[in-house]
């Protein structure tokens, strides 16, 4: 197994939990003192706060599922890694990615020695608006459509 595989798996677990609208499963991917920064800039600071933040979103909003492509996984130490990815969303009732909500994901993952697994210390979604560069938005959207067509959440 490559050294970055557990971090990629953690990222996919986060996406799958989001896609299944499962606040508890998504929060379980985080350290007790983990942080999340949403696409809209909202923040939740702690595993419990992340679950509390996501529960009403999933209960009252038809959240769109993600498809994503990992750009880089870089180890900062044997216990800390950064994953950078691009992601798109397929709005409910549609079959295509909405370029207006393409995002850049950043995951800071830490090895949890006690549990012998990896957890998110920070997960951030930043809009991939790329103002004034519609060709870049179109290229990213096509790249994400390729992932979507393969029927996978993440590549």
Which residues does each predicted region cover?
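A beta-strand edge to alpha-helix "cap/lid" segment located at domain peripheries
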Residues: 1-25, 35-155
